[in-house]
Amino acid sequence: MLEPWAYVGSEPAASAPGKQVRVLVLYPQLTANYGDRGNVLLLQRELEDRGCDVCVEEHGLGDVLPAAFYDAYLIGGAMPHERELIANDLRAGMAQHLAQAVDAGSVLLAVAGGLAALGDAGVLPVRAEPGDMEPAHAYAKLLVPGGEGELLAGYQMHAERYYLDNPRNALACMSAGYGNNGEDGTEGVRINNAYGTTLHGPALMRSRWLLERLADDILRRRGESGVDDA
């Protein structure tokens, strides 16, 4: 029997010398409820397939702030109590680090309760309010100028309603399901290389284009050749 979240596929490509990518997983002990750890493993494998040596580290409550920016940061979904603990810890200094890292071009992927915690701490322009929404399968189209984008798919487990300071910062528009709040048709948030979604699944398993985009953004930040500007 496979271990949880074991990857099934071809062997990764050999890593190019000096081509190391550093990934920081935020509060993994508090965000393990919905299988979002799979996003970490999928991104790691995608980067390895592109010839990268991937170093994955973890940051928990009370840990020392990183001395330098990572190439990517990931945070999964969290229950309300864990979300509060995370938000309080973020306010102690990690929120400022993340905001500066994103401004410097680092990639961030936040899911559901982790996204809400980042909003609570002021890292991303999103707020979560109490709600009564039910679990649902969801589909959304990526927002792109002048046309329809790729399909974003997953399932939603949040009762809260998520609101963006500016709906134009949504990652996608809903095709089915309720997205951020069931009212304005938005799903997730995107600010530069920071992506947030309410979808589990894990999201990167069901939406390969998003997995590839994150990897592209990471390599573009590092100045690697062979990545077209989007």
Predicted segments, located by residue:
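Glycine-rich beta-alpha junction loops
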Residues: 27-29, 159-161, 201-203
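Structural motif
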Residues: 72-76, 109, 196-198
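Pocket-forming structural segment of enzyme catalytic cores
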Residues: 120-188
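Beta-strand-turn-beta hairpins that frame and shape the catalytic cleft
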Residues: 18-21, 146-152, 190-195
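A glycine-centered loop/beta-turn motif at secondary-structure junctions
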Residues: 181-220
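Glycine-rich nucleotide phosphate-binding loop and flanking beta-alpha elements
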Residues: 80-81, 115-117, 161-163, 203-205
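Cysteine-nucleophile active-site neighborhood
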Residues: 79-146
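N-terminal beta1-alpha1 cap of cysteine-dependent amidohydrolase-like domains
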Residues: 1-96, 100, 205, 212-230
